[in-house]
Swiss-Prot record:
InterPro entries to which the protein is assigned, alphabetical: Class_I_gatase-like, CobQ/CobB/MinD/ParA_Nub-bd_dom, CobQ_GATase1, CobQ_N, CobQ_synth, GATase_3, P-loop_NTPase
Similarity comment: Belongs to the CobB/CobQ family. CobQ subfamily.
Keywords attached to this entry: Cobalamin biosynthesis, Glutamine amidotransferase
Source organism per UniProt: Gloeothece citriformis (strain PCC 7424) (Cyanothece sp. (strain PCC 7424))
Taxonomic lineage: Bacteria, Bacillati, Cyanobacteriota, Cyanophyceae, Oscillatoriophycideae
Keyword Metal-binding on entry: no
Biological role stated in the UniProt entry: Catalyzes amidations at positions B, D, E, and G on adenosylcobyrinic A,C-diamide. NH(2) groups are provided by glutamine, and one molecule of ATP is hydrogenolyzed for each amidation.
Annotated protein name in UniProt: Cobyric acid synthase
Active site: 330 (nucleophile), 435
Listed GO MF terms: ABC-type vitamin B12 transporter activity; catalytic activity
Gene3D superfamilies, per the entry: 3.40.50.880, P-loop containing nucleotide triphosphate hydrolases (3.40.50.300)
GATase cobBQ-type domain residues: 249-443
This protein's encoding gene: cobQ
This protein's pathway: Cofactor biosynthesis; adenosylcobalamin biosynthesis
Length: 495
């Protein structure tokens, strides 16, 4: 099987960005391409049509390659839960949870078997696999249990690219140090170096690039300039690089929970020209935005506890009582209820925790995870709009004790499936389980128009395409940027 591997000198060097770009570039050139990341640690995930869970970044890469996401593209997904533990997703299904110290003993062998098996299946269907590493391939203390960097490259005999982030400083030292720490047979696979996130005059790098090529014997294939393209973030650290649009007509705050997950839900909102989207730490003042969103969480109870102890829960209550709009998605939806129950102590030792008491619901955390794609129709803010998305949650939400039906407590079903979400009659508090909600263009605009009407602003057109079409334009822009600044000929000639 022909293969290209992308590894980085550090985390956030640009591996996902470059892998995605290569998928789109080579797909446009006629290759039948698949992305692959053997092991990913991330809280942004996606559900395949068969109900398997995988990293959202690999789903984006699949779309870039013009193919459907499938769990073989990311056979191991680690979802941090706090307290140095992670949930292990193996071939799309929950396999258990583990600590960093126990992971190697428990999952190294089955993990590698899953990786090798997934690659074998993909080899039957695709011309080329473009693999992404994780972190650095030269972490000496972790190398013996590294499942996703040079072990994969050696298994495939992959033509390997080393990408470095020059914006953080020390790029030349990062490259030289990484290469020095690789084994000779690993280093021999590195066929090109790519410098990423460069700001400034390109010619100023020329002398450094010549020295680097002479010293390492490896060509620098390109310098990718810093870009403001809104590329889907892989983990919450990427949120610090996001810039809030100033002077938006509509201001929306997203609570940056300690264990925030699936914040790719808000890329579509961030793409709206009239919206200023701000990620708010728990220590910051809530202010008086047009809406506040409580996003998904990997551990609902721990993040709910953080809302209470930080004082943010009280601020949210005051904001809602003053007529503010609050929307919760997935874990955020669960937090809006009266209480969260954990009888099996899945998230911790506390079996019951008080919610924000903004919706008449309660949630019970259960061992089995629900992962499924959904197609429904909206009741609010406009009825009859088709809405697609996906569920990823460990818990069942129902009406609170003593509540017989929604109408009795001033609420309505948000969709034609009541279990997916509810909204108060006042339309001040919204909650739903549907990830990808804002990707639905007509629904997103209808909700924004509801906010705009409250501000006395004119309505925006609702007859717009879904965000997946905007994502396609983004993927083409990413590919165009890389194609214009990286010489791929030496790499492709070796395939």
């Amino acid at each position: 099987m022909k293969a290209i591997m992308v590894v980085g000198t550090t985390s956030h060097a640009g591996k996902s960005f470059l892998t995605t770009a290569l998928c789109r570039i080579l797909a446009r050139r006629g290759w039948h391409v698949t992305p692959f990341k053997g092991q990913n640690m991330a809280l942004n995930s996606y559900v395949t049509p068969t109900g398997g869970e995988m990293g959202f970044a690999q789903a984006v890469q699949a779309w870039a390659a013009g193919t459907a996401p499938r769990v073989e593209m990311n056979p191991i997904l680690l979802k941090p839960q706090g307290n140095m533990t992670s949930q292990v997703i193996l071939m799309g299904k929950v396999a258990g949870q583990t600590t960093a110290s126990d992971y190697y003993e428990q999952y190294f062998k089955p993990g590698w078997e899953a990786i090798a098996s997934a690659l074998k299946r993909l080899a039957f269907e695709y011309d080329l696999v473009i693999c992404e590493g994780a972190g650095s391939p030269a972490e000496i203390n972790l190398k013996h249990r590294d499942l996703t960097n040079m072990r994969v490259a050696q298994h495939l005999g992959a033509t390997t690219l080393l990408v470095v982030d020059i914006d953080r400083g020390g790029a030349f030292a990062h490259v030289v140090g990484t290469l020095a720490l690789l084994d000779p047979e690993e280093r021999a696979l590195i066929k090109g170096i790519i410098i990423n996130k460069f700001r400034g005059q390109r010619s100023l790098l020329d002398s450094g690039i010549k020295w680097l090529e002479d010293y390492t014997g490896i060509p620098v294939l390109g310098v990718i300039p810093w870009s403001e393209i809104l590329f889907p973030a892989e983990d919450s650290l990427d949120l610090f690089e996001r810039k809030t649009k100033p002077n938006g007509e509509i201001n929306i705050n997203v609570i940056r929970l300690p264990r925030i997950s699936n914040f790719t839900d808000f890329d579509a909102l961030e793409s709206e020209p009239t919206v200023s989207l701000n990620y708010l730490d728990l220590s910051q003042e809530l202010g008086y935005p047009d809406a506040v969103i409580i996003p998904g969480s990997k551990t609902t109870i721990q993040d709910l506890s953080a809302l209470h102890t930080s004082g943010m829960a009280e601020k949210l209550e005051q904001y809602a009582n003053a007529g503010g709009i609050v929307l919760g998605i997935c874990g955020g939806f669960q937090m809006l209820g009266r209480r969260v129950l954990d009888p099996n102590q899945i998230e911790g030792k506390q079996e019951e925790f008080a919610g924000l008491n903004l919706l008449p619901i309660e949630t019970t955390i259960l061992p089995d995870k629900i992962t499924t794609q959904r197609q429904v129709f909206s009741n609010h803010p406009q009825s009859g709009l088709p809405v697609t998305g996906y569920e990823i949650h460990q818990g069942i939400t129902r009406l609170a004790d003593g509540v017989k039906n929604l109408e009795n407590v001033g609420c309505q079903a948000l969709f034609n499936d009541e279990k997916l979400g509810i909204v108060t009659h006042s339309q001040l508090v919204w909650g739903c389980y549907l990830h990808g909600l804002f990707d639905n263009g007509a629904w997103r605009r209808a909700w924004l128009n509801f906010l705009r009407h409250r501000r006395g602003l004119s309505a925006l057109p609702t007859g717009i395409p879904n965000y997946r079409e905007q994502r396609e334009a983004t993927l083409n822009s990413v590919a165009d940027l890389v194609e214009a600044n990286v010489n791929l000929s030496p790499i492709l000639s070796q395939l």
